[in-house]
Swiss-Prot record:
Protein name: Reduced meiotic recombination protein 1
Function summary: Required for normal levels of gene conversion events during meiosis.
Entry PTM: Sumoylated.
Gene: RMR1
Ubl conjugation recorded as keyword: yes
Protein family according to the UniProt entry: Belongs to the RMR1 family.
Keywords: Cytoplasm, Meiosis, Nucleus, Ubl conjugation
Pfam families for the chain: DUF2420
GO cellular component: cytoplasm; nucleus
Keyword Cytoplasm: yes
Transmembrane region(s): none
Amino acid sequence: MSEEEAHKTVEVDDVGVQLDEGDEEDLLEYDDELVEEQPSDARIRNVAETLMKSELPKVTVEYKDTTFLLFTSDDKNESNNPIICENAALYQRPMGEFMESIRKFMGNRFGRLAFATKELVLQLKSLDLTLFEDNVYNNHISFSDVYTIFKILKERSESNFETDIPTHLAIELSTRPRFVSRYNALVELTESSATLKNIKPFSNDETHPLIVDDNDQYTHQNTSEVIVMDIDDDVGEDSED
């Protein structure tokens, strides 16, 4: 086979096909059109994000007499409510990432110090379910899994013409002392002259700052070694379980 003949031969499914001059021109034109029509990665991502946002459910979050939207909603009545999770991908991400996004939003709005030693608690009364931020199983499920349960049960209730069916999933957000924060506060008591009578509710916010009396500190050292836990390390280990 001459060089000219080899140049006009292409392989289709490992089979060589001889092209004449007209076929070669058509093939080149087809390749150019294919390149022009092929969408870019950015366009694909934009389309995917648009589709995802259009499928996001309406979920409201109540905190301190304020109503937030968990995700973007097409409901015009809710258009003025702040949106907690602007990133639609969080709907299907592990619960740990989802919770971290809520913490970041609330911290920016109400001050990070208000949540520094607190664990987020999400109460879903319609499902009699409570989600805790530090739960070791958070990385095994997503919020999408939780909402799917609500959706299936709601649709069955509607089919059975039940009453008092919620129009959407509502969440009540609250906080509670983190175990590791309370534990470390108790460790501090063992390093002073404190007794059980000194056990008081732990607080470390702007309204009730934690005050340590230097004169009372270390007057009666406990000879036993007590381990102090780090919040970040504790959460990280839970995420890996």
